[in-house]
């Protein structure tokens, strides 16, 4: 009645195409984007990674696409929670209370410089902190932005996982050639725990991939690094009193851990550093 254009098709809730002043809505532009992509790209599946609070909006978008046969592709909304400040309230760009990425990057680097002053390594560590901190929580849950917590080398952080893989890398670089010996096949508790956890990679990978929930793989990576650090602390490798057969076994365990962590780093978009 006031000049707005509403579809008369049987779609619930009704589709508002244009407002009374002639302007378009998010739904209108999203539908236009679907039509454009259908003509120019035509993918089998479209995944919208958007705030969970937009759930109803995307349900209506996808329902409209199906109703009008705008595309035969599948459409999925992967929602995520909010990043909150110390006041437990979500950061909002319109309120002007959000970190600029450049400022955030510099603040993290300042906290990490005590671990390594090399600029290239600092940049990688900073990106690791940002990536891992965002992937670790269940994407459906809100989390509090805490710079101190995210950069704690002893916490559940990107710094911690980088330190573990660097430790493994250094062990492999310092190994000596061992020949004419069989590998020891008796495993202590630390060795069994680490190997058992390594064997569970497929499960956590597909939990993340099939459900669009990377926190399964991120949490698994942290537990893997934590278990490796316990193994490292309790088991000597290169000491003279360690038999060659045991050295060989433990080197292979370290190699398996290092290879797997680098694979998971790649899955999560994290670049390993060479040193810390």
Give a label for each model feature.
Residues 1-276:
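Non-catalytic interaction-recognition regions
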């Amino acid at each position: 009645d006031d000049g707005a254009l509403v579809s008369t098709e049987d779609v619930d809730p009704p589709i508002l195409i244009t407002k009374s002043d002639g302007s378009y809505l998010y739904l209108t532009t999203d539908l236009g984007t679907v039509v454009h992509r259908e003509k120019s790209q035509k993918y089998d599946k479209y995944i919208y990674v958007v705030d969970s609070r937009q759930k109803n909006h995307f349900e209506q978008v996808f329902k409209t696409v199906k109703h009008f046969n705008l595309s035969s592709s599948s459409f999925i909304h992967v929602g995520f929670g909010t990043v909150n400040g110390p006041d437990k309230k979500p950061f909002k760009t319109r309120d002007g209370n959000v970190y600029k990425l450049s400022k955030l990057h510099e603040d993290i680097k300042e906290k990490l410089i005590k671990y390594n002053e090399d600029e290239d390594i600092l940049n990688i560590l900073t990106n690791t902190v940002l990536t891992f901190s965002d992937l670790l929580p269940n994407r459906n849950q809100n989390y509090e932005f805490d710079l101190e917590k995210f950069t704690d080398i002893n916490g559940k952080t990107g710094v911690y996982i980088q330190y573990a893989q660097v430790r493994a890398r250094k062990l492999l670089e310092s190994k000596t050639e061992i020949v004419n010996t069989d590998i020891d096949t008796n495993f202590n508790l630390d060795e069994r725990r680490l190997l058992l956890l390594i064997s569970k990679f497929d499960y956590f990978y597909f939990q993340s991939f099939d459900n669009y929930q990377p926190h399964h793989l991120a949490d698994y990576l942290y537990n893997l690094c934590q278990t490796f650090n316990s193994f490292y602390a309790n088991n000597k490798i290169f000491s003279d009193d360690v038999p060659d057969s045991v050295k060989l076994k433990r080197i292979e365990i370290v190699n398996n851990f290092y290879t797997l962590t680098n694979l998971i780093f790649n899955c999560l978009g994290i670049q390993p550093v060479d040193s810390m």
